[in-house]
């Protein structure tokens, strides 16, 4: 696991965007898993800027999002399809037919929808990189604590805390989803590369639990210790409880030199 620590969230977004740019330049038809939430917004702004300045093209890129609320209209401003369109897809040259979310409505069998999403990923050769955030309790996607490390794309009931955290996004007269479709932990682990970004002191404990263990379903993100190509980009606040922060700070420069000399993505 490479842990790269930067001064602030702006530097996190810039460096994460640069990595994604290098990935797409190395493989213009890359299959990239994307995330929603507040953490990647600045990253997406950086990617839009790169596109507008003709430093990158998404014309042949395929994307697969981590999750989507169950039985939500894609035009609902709280759907993750709406989020991705407004934050990224509407502002770049991506073909929206090549953008995928794990959707399921009340008339569809969630098990079959999950299998279909897995088949879509497999048909394109698997994910080259999966972008992740991390919840305060260590969740990735909607894989909350106690989620199976062997899980695949499926429907999940949201925890009371997650429902509470997200309630500010829904109006009083709007029915808030209590379930969501999410990639499973095994689906995430199948990606050739995983890029997790985190900022803020509210993520510091989860970051330390992820990096330093123990490996436990109590912190779903701790499974990334077992990933061959996990890259973690965090700011100083998110690194503030990292037990071995000085070590990771020291080795960052060595990792940077190796990556510059031999490339960031040798396993593509």
UniProtKB/Swiss-Prot annotation:
CDD domains for this protein: GlcN6P_deaminase
Highest taxon listed in the record's lineage: Bacteria
SUPFAM superfamilies on file: NagB/RpiA/CoA transferase-like
GO terms for MF: glucosamine-6-phosphate deaminase activity; identical protein binding
Catalytic activity: alpha-D-glucosamine 6-phosphate + H2O = beta-D-fructose 6-phosphate + NH4(+)
GO process annotations (BP): carbohydrate metabolic process; glucosamine catabolic process; N-acetylglucosamine catabolic process; N-acetylneuraminate catabolic process
UniProt keyword terms in alphabetical order: Carbohydrate metabolism, Hydrolase
Active site, UniProt feature: 67, 137, 139, 144
GO cellular component: cytoplasm
Disulfide bridge map: none
Database matches in Gene3D superfamilies: 3.40.50.1360
PANTHER family from the UniProt entry: GLUCOSAMINE-6-PHOSPHATE ISOMERASE
Annotated family: Belongs to the glucosamine/galactosamine-6-phosphate isomerase family. NagB subfamily.
The protein's name: Glucosamine-6-phosphate deaminase
Gene name in the database record: nagB
